[in-house]
Structure formats: structure tokens, C-alpha cells
Amino acid sequence: FRKIEQRVWPPTTSFGAGWSTSSVSKIKLAKLGKPFQHKRKVVMSEKIKVGILGATGMVGQRFVTLLENHPWFELVTLAASAHSAGKTYEEAIGGRWKMETPMPEFVKNMVVKNVADVEDVVKNVDFVFSAVNMPKAKIRTIEEEYAKTETPVVSNNSAHRFTPDVPMVVPEINADHIDIIPAQRKRLGTKRGFV
């Protein structure tokens, strides 16, 4: 891992997309297998390496813009359908970039991986953001496949809305809903992975 300047975790600000520092801090702690609740600050010396599933769609593009120059996350992997796999991100998007800001330079030449090739996608990431656009049953299956590789999945999909052990978290309102994750891990047979 590449060292970066040390940052105090959690900082006192939020960073958009409905996430607050407290929720990210809890995800980081959950990822490391530590207790979910904490009272003291943790010093971060490395960025968290993340990937985006469904990176070529509208929500995936939004994740790309949110992660550009992010102080805590380093976007290292982009994944999309087999149609986009093997192309650079710029080629895969073509003229379909829908964000108000230009496509970030750092992603233009990243090669898009096939979202179905789970083992290849998770090789270099600490966790993934999921923005895949497919039938709900298939989303549930693929997100759980990623979790079973011990890769936490932060999903923007509603596919797990009625899955009893998958929390739907709005951090400022119900952050304690992540307390159900140990039950999900038991069902999936994982130590770190969850959706």
C-alpha cells in the first residue's frame, strides 16, 4: 500500500451521496473485523482502495466524480458489463458521459473489468461500491458473490430492500442498522464480507 499523509479518522465533515464520516468509519471498522461502535478517533495512514461495479452507468459515473481526489478513497478498479470489459473507461463510455463536470483524467485510461469476473475485480480493492443495472435477483446474487470473497459491498441498489439481514442505512437516521451485519456474515459464511 502506498503511504499518504496521516489523517484523523473520522474527520468532522460529510462527503455527499448520503454518507457521513461516522458511517464510513463504521464500514472501515467492520471491514477490519473490529467492533462497529467506537468512541476514539483512528489515524488513517493509507487510502482505502475501492472499485465501482456498474461504472459505466449514470450512478457509476456519479461515483467516479465523487471519488476523484477523495481524501480517504483511492479508485483503483472499474467494472461493468462484458460489452465494456477490456476497453478503456473513455472508450466504454463513448459519448455517454452524463455528468456536468468532464470525465476525470485519472479514469480515462483505466481498463474496465467484467463485473461477472468477481475474483479479478476484487484482487486490488478493500471494498466496492455497487451501481450495477440488472434485474434485482441478479443484483442480489452478484453482490453476495462479492461479499463471499470477503469484500464489503456498499450498494446503491434497492435489490436487497427486503433481505432481512442487509441494512438499508441512512447514516444520520439509522446508523445502528449496521448491527445486523454479523447475522448476514453468518448466513454468507464470511468474516469481513457483507452487503
Locate each region found by the language model.
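N-terminal Rossmann-like NAD(P) cofactor-binding subdomain of oxidoreductases
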Residues: K39-V195
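Short terminal hydrophobic/aromatic SLiMs and anchors at protein ends
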Residues: T12, K26-L29, H38
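Low-complexity, intrinsically disordered or signal/transmembrane-proximal segments
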Residues: Q6, Q37-H38
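Generic N-terminal simple sequence motifs
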Residues: Q6-R7, K31, E100
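Charged/polar low-complexity intrinsically disordered segments
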Residues: R2-K3, K26, K41
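Short Gly/Ser/Thr- and charged-rich N-terminal loops/segments
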Residues: G16-A17, V24, K31-G33
